């Protein structure tokens, strides 16, 4: 993936910032640690990170838990990631660059890939975009995109030299074991006490506070859970049928509670 491709992705995702003349949002202009998050839109900074093939990219389909993981990583390693920074705006030793890779053009040697069970991912995506959660057409649209994403990053890519796979469900069930993979990716032993302290800070309310730029990131209303339960009951089979259509092997990467890593 070239620096130009990364820059186009940044411009697309953070058009509002660039449109307000914040294209050089370097550290002195950012919020402090305990305030809301900030965005780096300085192309020189992004190009410098991207030009080093050994730097880590964090790749995830939308609505798979990347905000939570990035906040954990930033506090645990005390290093920010590009391009949104949550806690350490005055540091420039960036740990990763996050991308959703929706156009499936990213090819990097060093990658952490985060994924989540497809039914909940698709529901969350529909809800985020305020699309009708009962529309089979929209369900199929997002499921097909996610299926291609999973197929690329779990099965078909042949360009990574170092790839660590992390799951949202694994983080929820056993954060210590799952985050140990992340620590290992950066050749660091897991510090259990440090992780416990960091995880204790990052509640859903904290993620909500740090993502005030986008109120749709975290849903706290009680009705959300009920609507999701109905979606699961009515559309789970359809989501799996679309996901595995032409890709039957994708089912091997999921279990009822935790996921296999091939």
Annotate each PLM feature.
Residues 100-227, 237:
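PAPS-dependent sulfotransferase catalytic domain
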Residues 67-78:
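A conserved segment at the C-terminal end of the G1
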Residues 59-60:
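The Walker A (P-loop) glycine that initiates the GxxxxGKT/S ATP-binding motif of P-loop NTPases
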Residues 1-56, 126, 188-262:
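PAPS-dependent sulfotransferases, especially Golgi type II membrane carbohydrate sulfotransferases
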Residues 80-104:
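Cysteine-dependent PTP/DSP-like catalytic domain, specifically the C-terminal lobe
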Residues 52-54, 92, 107-108, 159:
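Residue-level preference for short coil/turn positions at secondary-structure junctions
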């Amino acid at each position: 993936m070239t620096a130009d491709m990364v820059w186009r992705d940044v411009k697309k995702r953070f058009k509002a910032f660039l449109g307000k003349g914040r294209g050089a949002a370097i550290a002195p202009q950012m919020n402090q640690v305990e305030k809301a998050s900030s965005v780096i839109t300085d192309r020189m900074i992004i190009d410098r990170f991207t030009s080093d093939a050994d730097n880590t990219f964090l790749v995830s389909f939308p609505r798979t838990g990347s905000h939570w993981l990035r906040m954990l990583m930033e506090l645990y390693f005390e290093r920010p990631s590009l391009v949104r920074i949550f806690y350490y705006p005055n540091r420039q030793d960036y740990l990763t660059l996050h991308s959703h890779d929706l156009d499936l053009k990213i090819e990097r040697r060093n990658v952490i890939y985060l994924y989540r069970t497809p039914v909940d991912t698709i529901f969350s995506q529909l809800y985020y975009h305020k699309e009708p959660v009962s529309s089979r057409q929209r369900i199929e649209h997002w499921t097909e995109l996610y299926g291609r994403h999973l197929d690329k990053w779990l099965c078909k890519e042949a360009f990574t030299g170092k790839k660590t796979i992390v799951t949202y469900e694994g983080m929820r069930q056993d954060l210590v074991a799952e985050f140990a993979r992340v620590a290992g990716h950066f050749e660091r032993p897991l510090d259990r006490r440090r992780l416990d302290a960091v995880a204790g800070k990052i509640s859903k309310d904290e993620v909500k506070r740090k993502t005030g730029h986008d109120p749709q990131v975290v849903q706290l209303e009680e009705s959300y859970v009920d609507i999701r339960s109905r979606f699961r009951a009515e559309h789970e089979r359809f989501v799996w049928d679309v996901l595995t259509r032409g890709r039957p092997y994708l089912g091997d990467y999921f279990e009822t509670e935790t996921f296999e890593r091939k």
